[in-house]
Amino acid sequence: MGYRYLNADWVAMMSQDDRELLQDLYNLFAEQCGRLSEFLAQIPKNPPVDSQAANALADLLHKTRGSASSLGILHIPDAMRALEAEVRSGAAWDSVESTLRTLHSQLSEALGEFRSYIEAQDGR
């Protein structure tokens, strides 16, 4: 099965070395994605978003990017790095929100791929 975001070879190698660590990383990544979902749900209907919220988002993007990279997720960490830079530079909120919603969708897909991969490995 081909994956869009999951580097299955990397995950297979890691799961042989430390299955528990892999599960912990997945749980952390899922938690951070959940926090991004909460952030999206709280976005005010009429921006601007205050600088404290923007900084919190940038920090969350940074942490989630690190988790995604640790899990061998492809493509998304680069997009997260770019969005984090946009947020930190004070880019127009409409652009940030649009990119964040797209990225959130990709993160959800990556989580699903990872979960499917792990379940398939457990079923062997």
Describe these PLM feature segments:
Residues M1-R124:
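Two-component system phosphorelay core
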